[in-house]
C-alpha cells in the first residue's frame, strides 16, 4: 500500500492526517490514553515531550553557514513576518475580546489564533517554491526561517504587545532544546545528520498527540473561520512581505508571496502557549483547529499565487 504517497498528496498531510486521526480518537474514545496506560498513553498525551525532542532535532538540522545574499533575504522575510504579526496582535488585542469571537461565522478567532497562524512560515513550502521560481540563494533563506519554529516568537509577540506576561525562565525553557541541538549540530556534522534526519519522522507523532487535544466538533464549528484565517494570513502578511522583498531584499516579490503561509508546526503553538500562560487555555482548542485549517488553505493557495506572480513579474518565468 502506498500510504505515504497518498499522505504526501494532501497539503501538509504529514502533519494534518495524524492530527485528524488524533482528533477522531479524542472525540470518540476520549479516555483511551488513561485506559491503556503505559506507552500508548505516552503517544496519546505526550505532545510536550515529543515537541521538545522535535525542537532539539530542528535546531541540530540548521547549519551555521550562509552567504550574505541568503542572510539578507531570509532576515528581511523573517523580520517582516514577525513585525506584521506583532502589529496584528496590537490591533486584535484592542478590538477582540480576551476569549475571542464567540458567535457568528468567525467564532473562534482570537489573538492567539491570529498570531500563531501569521508569525511562522512554512519553510519547506517556501524552499520548494523558490527552487522552482527563484534563485538558490532565495531558496536557502528557509534556513533562518527555522528559527521561527516553536512558541518563542509567539511568546515575544504576545509579550511585546502587552497581551500576555511570561516569566523570564519560560523564554529560556522554550528555546533551550533548540539552542542545544543547534550547538551540537554545528560542532559535529555527524550529529547534525543523525538528529536532522529525525525532524520529519517526529512530525506525525506530535501531530497525533496534538490531535488528541481537539474535539472534531470544534473543527466543524470553526470551518469557515479557519478558511477566512488562511486567506487573511496570505493577504495581511503577503503584502508587507512583497514590499519588503522588492525594496529591501532586492527581489521581485516572488519570495514574499512564497513566504505568506502558515507553518505546520504552528498548529502546536496554541497548546504550548496555553501550557505556559493558562489565561489562553479557553481558546487553545479552537485556535489549534483554526491554525490547522489555515495551514491547509495557505498550502493550497500560496503555490498557485506564487506561480502567477512569478509568471507576471519574473523575466525567466514570463
Curated annotation (Swiss-Prot):
InterPro entries membership: 2keto-3dGluconate_permease, 2keto-3dGluconate_permease_sub
Name by which UniProt lists this protein: 2-keto-3-deoxygluconate permease
GO molecular function, a single term: 2-keto-3-deoxygluconate:proton symporter activity
Annotated function: Catalyzes the proton-dependent uptake of 2-keto-3-deoxygluconate (KDG) into the cell.
Keywords: Cell inner membrane, Cell membrane, Membrane, Sugar transport, Symport, Transmembrane, Transmembrane helix, Transport
Subcellular localization(s) per the UniProt record: Cell inner membrane
Topology term for the membrane: Multi-pass membrane protein
Superkingdom of the source species: Bacteria
Assigned protein family: Belongs to the KdgT transporter family.
Catalytic activity: 2-dehydro-3-deoxy-D-gluconate(in) + H(+)(in) = 2-dehydro-3-deoxy-D-gluconate(out) + H(+)(out)
Any one of the GO CC terms: plasma membrane
Transmembrane segments: 10-30, 42-62, 76-96, 105-125, 139-159, 162-182, 199-219, 224-244, 263-283, 289-309
Pfam families xrefs: KdgT
